[in-house]
Amino acid sequence: MVDSTLIKDSNDTDTDTGVAEPAIKPHLILALDYGVKKMGMALGNSLTETARAFDILAMNNGQPDWDNLLGIIKVWGVAKVVVGLPLNMDGSSSMLSKRAHKFARRLAHRIMEQHLPVIVSLCDERLTSVAAREIAWENGWIQNERDPIDDISACILMSTYFADPNSSIAIDAIKAD
């Protein structure tokens, strides 16, 4: 297996300061397309800015199997989690966006309790499901309107994040309820 970390030669130093430059290390980012019944997941690489559909988790009234979700974050070495924020088209909050925000706070709190160095943020996910369904139809990945596309939506969310990472909102774990 090839490590995707770019390692610089130890002789690579800044000629002005004589200090070795740090190696460029990609971070794995987990995008979550939050939903009350299911949640799509995609993994992204911060260096290549690519994403791939990962899984769809069953939700119990908006709550995941926390042990499973935290296990995925640990095992994959995720550095950041981007939770989709389903705003209304005019940018106002919806009932689902309030639940997604609450979920993100709870996730940040649980990550903090586990002493994991993971940042949780929210990112606007308007129209990701529409785009995901269109892509899935065009590629023959789904056969009918009821086939799940949540993981594809999470990929599109990741692309949105990569296009403008500064538009995401970091979540403070202290405010978890």
Curated annotation (Swiss-Prot):
Return the SUPFAM superfamilies for the record. Answer: Ribonuclease H-like
One Pfam family recorded for the sequence: RuvX
Gene3D superfamilies hit by this protein: YqgF/RNase H-like domain
Q: Where is it localised?
A: Cytoplasm
Q: What is its main location?
A: cytoplasm
Q: What is its EC number?
A: 3.1.-.-
Q: Which CDD domains match?
A: YqgF
Q: Which UniProt keywords apply?
A: Cytoplasm, Hydrolase, Nuclease, Ribosome biogenesis
Question: Would you kindly state one Gene Ontology biological process term found in this protein's UniProt entry?
Answer: rRNA 5'-end processing
Q: Give the CC-aspect GO terms.
A: cytosol
Gene Ontology terms for molecular function:
nuclease activity
What domain of life does the native source organism fall in? Bacteria
Sequence similarity: Belongs to the YqgF nuclease family.
PANTHER family, per database record: POLYNUCLEOTIDYL TRANSFERASE, RIBONUCLEASE H-LIKE SUPERFAMILY PROTEIN (PTHR33317:SF4)
Annotated NCBIfam families:
RNAse_H_YqgF
Its biological purpose is as follows:
Could be a nuclease involved in processing of the 5'-end of pre-16S rRNA.
Name of the molecule in the record: Putative pre-16S rRNA nuclease
Tell me the organism. Psychrobacter arcticus (strain DSM 17307 / VKM B-2377 / 273-4)
